[in-house]
Amino acid sequence: MIRCAILGSSGLVSQTIQYLLENHPWFELVQVAGSEEKVGMQTSDFEWRLPFERPRNDFKISSLDDVKDVEIVFSALPSDIAAIWEKKLAKNGMNVFSNASSFRRVTGVPMLIPEMDDSGFIGYQNHACATNCTVIPVAIPLYAITQHA
């Protein structure tokens, strides 16, 4: 299992990642880190806002400074905070996958839609980001059409 952490503790993106990782066959979520005012709280302390069941795992929120001993970091941080922390963690050797817009136009940080092209990450450093969410509903069907045209 690949040990993972989530940056961001209570928002919709963080909750979605928590849900997706709970029973994943490859990834083991071992840490959720958040803002200083949330450090020490449990993930169960936050209102669950998604339309599916809350994960059974309950994590004590750690400081962003304490993220360690993981191979992959899934970031759900606001862009201004992500700009600082994602770069720092990537420089420390962690593989960072971001949902923030901070690095979407930075050379050497690929924007990926894994459903379309997971090979886009090959040859890059250990930092990648997701596209803007409005792109996905258009890009994936267009990709499927081009692949089967």
Where are these regions (language model features)?
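N-terminal Rossmann-like NAD(P) cofactor-binding subdomain of oxidoreductases
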Residues: 1-149
